[in-house]
Amino acid sequence: MIQNMAYRKLQVIRISFHNWEDFFSIINKYPEKGADKMKQFKIIATAASGMEALVGKELRDLGIECQVENGKAIFHGDIETIATANLWLRTADRIKIVVGEFKAVTFDELFEKTKALPWEDILPMDAEFPVAGKSLKSTLFSISDCQAITKKAIVSRLSEVYHRYGRLPESGAKFPLEVALLKDHVTITLDTTGPSLFKRGYRLEKGGAPLKENMAAALVMLTSWRKDRPFYDPVCGSGTICIEAALMGHNIAPGFNREFLCEEWDWVDAAIFEKVRTEADAKADYDIKLDIMGSDIDGKMIQVAQRNAEEIGLGDSIVFKQMQLKDFTTEKEYGVIVANPPYGERLGEEEAVQQLYREMGETYRPLKTWSKYILTSDLTFETHYKARATKKRKLYNGALRTDLFQYWGTRPPRAPRVEKTEE
């Protein structure tokens, strides 16, 4: 009797299929939880212009070989590699899987080559898969048409594989895709990250012109700072630069307190992310004492910065203080100053900002052992600071071109070499 009931249930489930062969083909093709469908992937870590080399260095420090190109670093690996990159990369924007690459100069070619990709290995029948697009120097220049044709090709493939004769439900997990054309070369990618990597989850509030967390991390990484030396941000705002420095000082993975989109996918084993997070927690040095200070003339922003630091558990690692920039004095040596002052882009602000630059020069030039790094879009900064930078580096703060003016301090003396004596 039980067998007859089970058979009748299968008959009901099978109604939407033409025959038993179709039904069992779906059962066999649907991606399973933790299934090893695409063990090795070609992966892209996207980055803002000017930050690609930093992303490449981060990957190599993680033991991942990569190739750095404009706006991205390319590498290969499995799901654990993807989890590691999402969790640990401080300066990247997103981690994407390359689903396919090919040349296309006609819409028919784009359709057929997209349809030929093994979409059933990635997208379950109920997957929600929005398709973004971009095109540069390509025959197929209409982005909306490229998006529509790519979507149509994927739907056609999945409808055949899953034997669907109506619309795909798209009611399940989200799989954001992008079709990108560059000089007729098509790259289709799948985003594993979700909200951009700069969203660490600690910024409860922000100031008027906030610096993204990955940009703040890049500024710290471009300095000579080491965790045993003083670190100071004189215009700290909501505290982002100081918090990113503290995360590095404690060796805390920037993505430790957030989740990633691919964790919702059936073919991504939750145990892999749990393993990577456990290993990251073991690598963190929560007990080290750091000398990090942030100040701002706005007392309300100091309160915001303190709350943000406390949100991520770093309230005791950073000292925030309301203070005018010109009031900073110190007897400490070999510290690092990182500042992202107002740029004076708005009408009427230019003179006030230039006065701030002059105060920076008067306050910081006497600190011969300290290294100073100031980010601004004002290319005349050196004139107001009254000193030529040791080095300048072009960076993009969003779409805005900025320069990091670097003033290197004297190097600390080397520790005396201890000669080994023979016993």
Region locations from a protein language model:
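Short, Lys/Arg-enriched N-terminal segments with co-localized hydrophobic residues
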Residues: H18-K37
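C-terminal catalytic and target-recognition region of SAM-dependent MTase-like enzymes
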Residues: Q324-E423
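S-adenosyl-L-methionine
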Residues: F41-M51, V55, G77, T81-T84, ...
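Non-catalytic nucleic-acid substrate-recognition regions in nucleic-acid-modifying enzymes
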Residues: K39-A173, E423
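Conserved S-adenosyl-L-methionine
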Residues: L211-T329, E345-R346, E350-A352
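A short, flexible beta-alpha/helix-coil linker loop
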Residues: L136-T139, S196, P342-R346
